[in-house]
Regions:
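Beta-hairpin "wing" of winged helix-turn-helix
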Residues: 64-80, 88
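A generic structural micro-feature
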Residues: 13, 79-83
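Amphipathic alpha-helical dimerization/coiled-coil segments
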Residues: 2, 92-126
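Basic amphipathic alpha-helical segments that dock to polyanions
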Residues: 54-61
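Short, Lys/Arg-enriched N-terminal segment that forms or immediately precedes the first helix
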Residues: 1-10
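N-terminal helix-turn-helix DNA-binding core of bacterial DNA-binding proteins
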Residues: 9-53
Length: 126
């Protein structure tokens, strides 16, 4: 992905795993387990990301330049080389996240205009 990002739209749609990881990192850096917890919270438990999916996706996202490993330690006292790796969005990752969120919002708007989505969920409409 990193070689030819002259036209990032070519890489949309993002996979659900990549989208959820980018979304989890949107408000700051996190370690892998923190990302898994954030994805679970953001999706109200509907998406449970296991370590294989998470770290496979992280590896590809690092190579693509969507995220980077943080050089900073969350706790300066942690000088143990076995410390957890922390990840953060790059400018490209934030741009791709925004583009995908806009694409998804457009799809939701279409569903609304076709009366697929209930406008008042408190009434239990379907």
């Amino acid at each position: 992905m990193a070689e030819s990002l002259q036209n990032p739209e070519e890489y949309l749609p993002l996979t659900p795993a990549v989208f959820n990881i980018l979304l989890a990192l949107a408000d700051g850096e996190k370690h892998g387990y923190g990302i898994m917890l954030e994805v679970e919270a953001n999706t109200k438990g509907q998406v449970l990301m296991g370590p294989g999916t998470l770290y496979g996706s992280i590896k590809r996202m690092l190579q693509a330049g969507l995220i980077e490993e943080s050089d900073e330690r969350a706790d300066p006292e942690m000088d143990d080389p076995r410390r957890r790796a922390y990840y953060r969005l790059t400018a490209l990752g934030r741009r791709m996240l925004r583009m995908e969120a806009e694409r998804l919002a457009s799809q939701v708007q279409i569903a609304k205009t076709k009366n697929i989505l209930a406008t008042d969920f408190s009434r239990g409409a379907t």
